[in-house]
């Protein structure tokens, strides 16, 4: 469609520049380059979604400023291409209709991007809800004055985090320019004495107890017929009071013995741990060999020889302040001895209880500076009994801190180390346990020599919950991910740095736990910080009447799951006549009569099942009178697209315009022929 040029050499420079820009934006060359660039981006977005999932492509492509800019430039190009030809001729009608349709379509896409809802509603059977949770999160700060009074709420504080752990940007995923997508790092709020900084973020995480160790016991050469490799994973966590614990998490039997983990209370105890091994030359007798470590001096004695005797000074004790020992009780059922130790014959006594099989609960004498161990050699009939642990073989692993480099140079940046002590009668050995995964000898078995390796070490001075990252999983539902952010919260000059877990998306709202709500105490007020999922109220209730899940035969993989739901108003009145069924590949459309909005509901996934005894089962059924045999939750996706009708209208105009250009032009918009002039008389 030929058109005359608007810019001319005789025009003022500013006018000529504006008209030249106008002509460039309306040119076919600019449109072709822009469309080709968008085609490349759309193709790249397809690969990104295939490799990293919908959440990642929304973050890295569809919702970015540069993709919005490309679409805006396309809209400007379309508008200028049509406007520059004004006034339009009749034969340009199809061209104009097509361009109007393209602009309407782009406007509908913008409405969908800015005002659409794509969120999840988790529901238990018999429950109903109207809150749909999105993939994004926000912070909230509750400020409470000391001494009572009304609390102030700061937030929601927007937080754009992205779909990956922040440590992964620029490394494993460097082939795609994720940095062009905005993330809220650093200071995201600073007002009225409250400052919030985000230092790190995990898109998915798990919680682990600290101090704890994750070990492997086994070998790469187990013998013929076993594939050569055999490794047993062992997860152990320190238990402050193991005798009263409801769950044994600090010891486990494996490989013909027991592996025990605990935390030493001092450098002296850690050094005594290494020194307190028995000497086979002394023997063990019937009641075992007692080893006492006294300020670096090691005293070994048979319980049979010293039980019930008057207080005595072991050979090699210090001359200035000799150690006196009195072993006055032996308990065969506990495999332990009771003794008193003192400095000098008339010094104050300190009671000790030394247990052979429970060294983690042994009562030492730290005031006197004495630490003890007891070693009992048990006879077993054969290798089978040894494999069952009847020989009492054991590996003790302890966390220590502050040991000199001469003892071990293998330590964390904070100075924590791991020590181990192996007991397999009649010998024992002790040393530093490498935290980098290098093996140390473990139990000697009939077919192989086992080794012990450290896969993970989480040190801590006191019992704590540590946040650990999980690898990216594009197929994992957003509702199943545990988000976590490392933040620094400053209130009136008081700053604390910690990991904060996001509140989980679950069918029942519960108060946040200790890892999900952190409080900073300032002189005159306190600030409680939470990380909440963004939620929208869809305006009506969805009630789950029944959830059905079928498995593939012989597997635990779900082959089909569906939900039977009802739509109800806020007053409980049904909005549709009968319940509807939502299946995996058959969404349901629902128009809210109150707002006129049209929603589409998909069966996305499910949660559970949870059985009696599970933590979530007990929490969800705490108030229920009749508890079900099991609990399952259905996760429905609610989709609202405000631009759907606009996009349909734009697509319709494009079809009409193309039809007009190619099929109606010759009939309705052909140039009129001049009527033949009458012949002269």
Regions flagged by a language model, labelled:
Residues 32, 57-70, 96-107, 580-607:
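Amphipathic alpha-helical packing elements
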Residues 11-25, 83:
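Cytosolic juxtamembrane amphipathic/interface segments immediately preceding
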Residues 2-5, 9, 50, 54, ...:
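Membrane-embedded alpha-helical bundles that constitute the cytochrome b-like, heme-associated redox core
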Residues 3-15, 625-626:
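Short, membrane-interfacial amphipathic segments enriched in basic
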Residues 30-90:
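Membrane-embedded alpha-helical segments of integral membrane proteins
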Residues 63-138, 632-635, 639-673:
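Internal alpha-helical transmembrane segments
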Residues 671-681:
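Cytoplasmic C-terminal tails of single-pass
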Residues 121-635, 639:
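Soluble non-transmembrane domains of integral membrane proteins
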């Amino acid at each position: 469609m030929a058109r005359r040029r608007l810019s001319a050499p005789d025009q003022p420079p500013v006018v000529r520049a504006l008209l030249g820009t106008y002509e460039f934006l309306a040119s076919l060359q600019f449109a072709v380059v822009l469309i080709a660039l968008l085609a490349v981006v759309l193709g790249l977005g397809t690969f990104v979604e295939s490799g990293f999932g919908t959440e990642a492509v929304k973050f890295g492509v569809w919702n970015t400023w540069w993709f919005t800019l490309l679409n805006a430039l396309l809209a400007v190009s379309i508008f200028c291409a049509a406007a520059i030809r004004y006034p339009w001729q009749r034969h340009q009608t199809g061209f104009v209709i097509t361009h109007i349709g393209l602009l309407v379509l782009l406007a509908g896409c913008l409405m969908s991007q800015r005002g659409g809802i794509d969120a999840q509603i988790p529901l238990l059977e018999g429950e109903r809800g109207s809150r749909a949770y999105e993939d994004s999160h926000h912070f909230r700060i509750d400020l409470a004055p000391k001494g009572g009074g009304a609390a102030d709420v700061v937030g929601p504080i927007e937080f754009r985090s992205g779909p990956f752990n922040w440590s992964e940007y620029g490394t494993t995923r460097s082939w795609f320019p994720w940095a062009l997508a905005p993330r809220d790092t650093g200071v995201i709020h600073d007002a009225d004495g409250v400052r919030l900084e985000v230092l790190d973020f995990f898109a998915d995480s798990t919680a682990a107890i600290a101090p704890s160790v994750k070990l492997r016991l086994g070998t790469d050469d187990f013998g013929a017929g076993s594939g050569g490799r055999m490794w047993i994973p062992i997860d152990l966590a320190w238990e402050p009071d193991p005798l009263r614990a409801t769950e044994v998490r600090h010891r486990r039997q494996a490989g013909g013995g027991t592996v025990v983990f605990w935390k030493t209370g001092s450098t002296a105890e850690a050094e005594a741990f290494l020194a307190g091994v028995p000497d086979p030359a002394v023997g063990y007798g019937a009641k075992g060999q007692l080893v006492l470590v006294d300020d670096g001096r090691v005293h070994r004695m048979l319980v049979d020889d010293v039980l019930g005797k008057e207080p005595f000074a072991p050979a090699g004790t210090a001359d200035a302040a000799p150690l006196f020992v009195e072993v006055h009780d032996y308990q065969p059922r506990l495999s332990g001895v009771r003794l008193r130790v003192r400095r000098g014959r008339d010094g104050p006594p300190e009671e000790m209880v030394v247990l052979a099989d429970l060294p983690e609960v042994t009562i030492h004498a730290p005031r006197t500076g004495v630490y003890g161990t007891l070693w009992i050699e048990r006879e077993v009939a054969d290798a089978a009994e040894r494999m069952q642990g009847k020989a009492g073989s054991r590996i003790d692993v302890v966390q220590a801190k502050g040991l000199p480099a001469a003892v071990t140079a293998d330590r964390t940046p904070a100075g924590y180390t791991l020590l181990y002590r192996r007991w397999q009668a009649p010998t024992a050995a002790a040393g530093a346990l490498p935290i980098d995964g290098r093996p140390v000898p473990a139990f000697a078995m009939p077919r192989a020599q086992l080794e012990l390796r450290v896969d993970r070490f989480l040190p801590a001075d006191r019992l704590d919950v540590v946040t650990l990252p999980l690898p990216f999983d594009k197929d994992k539902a957003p509702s199943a991910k545990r988000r976590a952010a490392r933040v620094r919260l400053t209130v009136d000059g008081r700053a604390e740095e910690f990991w904060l877990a996001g509140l989980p998306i679950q069918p029942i709202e519960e108060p946040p736990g200790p890892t999900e709500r952190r409080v900073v105490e300032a002189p005159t007020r306190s600030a409680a910080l939470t990380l909440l999922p963004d939620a929208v109220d869809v305006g009506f209730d969805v009630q789950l009447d029944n959830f059905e899940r079928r498995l593939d035969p012989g597997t635990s993989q779900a082959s089909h799951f569906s939900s039977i739901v009802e739509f109800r108003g806020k007053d409980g009145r049904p909005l549709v006549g009968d319940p509807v069924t939502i299946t995996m590949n058959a969404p349901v459309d629902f128009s809210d009569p109150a707002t006129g909005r049209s929603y589409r509901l998909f069966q996305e996934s499910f949660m559970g099942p949870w059985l009696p005894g599970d933590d979530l089962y007990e929490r969800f059924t705490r108030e229920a009178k009749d508890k079900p045999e099991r609990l399952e939750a259905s996760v429905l996706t609610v989709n609202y697209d405000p631009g759907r009708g606009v996009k349909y209208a734009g697509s319709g105009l494009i079809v009409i315009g193309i039809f007009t250009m190619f099929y109606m032009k010759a009939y309705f918009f052909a140039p009129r022929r001049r009527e033949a002039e009458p012949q002269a008389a």
